[in-house]
Amino acid sequence: MVVEANCEIPENLYYYIDGKNTVWVKIEGSDIAVVGITDLAQTMAGKIVKIRIKKKGIKVERGRPVATLESGKWAGPVPAPVSGEVVDSNSEVEKSPVILNRDPYGQGWIAKIKISNQEEVKQLLTGQQAIQKLKEIITSEKLTCKRLQ
């Protein structure tokens, strides 16, 4: 785990970064992408009060929303890091969205997507490349991450 400005960056995950939108991805088996928002994303959003997640069976395209978040200061998409079909969504974060602020890499997972294009996994960032890009966002946004209790 790398920590930069109090922002946690797990080294064992993949990342989809589109501007300031930062999403983490964990591959389960060979074709399931577990998706969530990063520590940076939850800090920039502030206290998340609502999340809408695409339902099971819905097809999503890479870069298009798999969910939408609302906080007191921000509303916007959680982009799908890969194309595929939503096979599960986290009903716990829909009931209690603040879980995303408290545990973005654990209980705060958002959706599971059955990957339809394996080539897109190769386009995700990982390792030092991901860490460097996330550190650049932390610096440019002057972020110091904090978790809500």
Swiss-Prot record:
Domain Lipoyl-binding stretches: 32-114
Record NCBIfam families: PRK01202.1
Source organism, top-level taxon: Archaea
Family affiliation: Belongs to the GcvH family.
Keywords, sorted A to Z: Lipoyl
Residues in the signal sequence: none
Entry GO terms, CC: cytoplasm; glycine cleavage complex
InterPro entries (UniProt xref): 2-oxoA_DH_lipoyl-BS, Biotin_lipoyl, GCV_H, GCV_H/Fam206, Single_hybrid_motif
Pfam families associated with the record: GCV_H
GO BP terms: glycine decarboxylation via glycine cleavage system
Function summary: The glycine cleavage system catalyzes the degradation of glycine. The H protein shuttles the methylamine group of glycine from the P protein to the T protein.
SUPFAM superfamilies hit by this protein: Single hybrid motif
Cofactor: (R)-lipoate
Stored PANTHER family: GLYCINE CLEAVAGE SYSTEM H PROTEIN, GLYCINE CLEAVAGE SYSTEM H PROTEIN-RELATED
Transmembrane portions of the chain: none
Record's protein name: Probable glycine cleavage system H protein 2
Note describing how the cofactor binds: Binds 1 lipoyl cofactor covalently.
Residues annotated with N6-lipoyllysine modification: K73
Subunit note: The glycine cleavage system is composed of four proteins: P, T, L and H.
